[in-house]
C-alpha cells in the first residue's frame, strides 16, 4: 500500500520545486516514487524529467477520450533517481475546468492499478482554490502538506487549505502533516515569525524551513532537482530541509493532525499583530 501525499499551497511560491525535491529525497532514500502534477501549467515534474512531458489530457485526446485504450506507458515518464512522473494537464486557457481534469486523472490511476505499484505517490496540486476536482487528491491522501511563505496572502491561502483538509477528514483518512516554510529570509522577510504563529493557531507545525537561496532558483530554471545540481559550498544547506521532510514521512507513524482553521475575519485581525 502506497504512502499518498497531497502537497498544496498558494500559486507561485515554489510549491512544485519543493514537491520535486521532496520526491527526490524520498527516492534517494530507497522509495519508489510517483509524482503527479495537478495544475494546467503542467510543469510540476519539470525539475525531475527536465522537460514538459505529455499530459493525461493530451494522451486522452489522442485516443478520443477512450480511457481503456491508455496504458501507464502512455502517460508516465521516468526521471531523476527513477522517479515516475505524470502530469494531469488541463483545458486551453479560458475554457473548461482544470479541476475536472485532475479528478479524471485520479480516476485513471485507479483504472490502471497504479496505486499499489509505488511506495510513495505525491500529488502536487494547484492550491489557491480547492474546488471539487482539485480537492480530489485529499480523498486518497494519508497526509497533506502545505507549502507557504512568511506573508499574509500565502497564510490566508494556507488557512483555506486547512478548511478543506478539515472538511475532507470527516469522511476520509487525510491529516495535515505540517507546513513547509519556503523561501525563508531572515534578513528582510522576518524569517518565519508569521508562519510560526499561524501554525500554532491551527494546531500544526513547521515541517522544515527552506532557505531563500539563489541555488534553488537556478535549479528550477535548469530543470533539475537540487540533488542533481553541481556540488557547491551552499548545496548541503539547501538540501537539509528536503531531507528532514523525507525523514519525517518515512518514519513508522508520522505525527499528524486535523487542523482547526481560523475564520477569515480572524485572520485579518491577526494581521495587526504582524506589522
From Swiss-Prot:
UniProt-listed InterPro entries: NifH/chlL_CS (IPR030655), NifH/frxC (IPR000392), P-loop_NTPase (IPR027417), Protochlorophyllide_ATP-bd (IPR005971)
Binding site for Mg(2+): 16
Any Pfam family hit: Fer4_NifH
Protein keywords: 4Fe-4S, ATP-binding, Bacteriochlorophyll biosynthesis, Chlorophyll biosynthesis, Iron, Iron-sulfur, Magnesium, Metal-binding, Nucleotide-binding, Oxidoreductase, Photosynthesis
Domain of life (superkingdom): Bacteria
Pathway stated in the Swiss-Prot or TrEMBL entry: Porphyrin-containing compound metabolism; bacteriochlorophyll biosynthesis (light-independent)
Role played: Component of the dark-operative protochlorophyllide reductase (DPOR) that uses Mg-ATP and reduced ferredoxin to reduce ring D of protochlorophyllide (Pchlide) to form chlorophyllide a (Chlide). This reaction is light-independent. The L component serves as a unique electron donor to the NB-component of the complex, and binds Mg-ATP.
The name this protein goes by in its record: Light-independent protochlorophyllide reductase iron-sulfur ATP-binding protein
Organism (species): Pelodictyon phaeoclathratiforme (strain DSM 5477 / BU-1)
Gene (UniProt): bchL
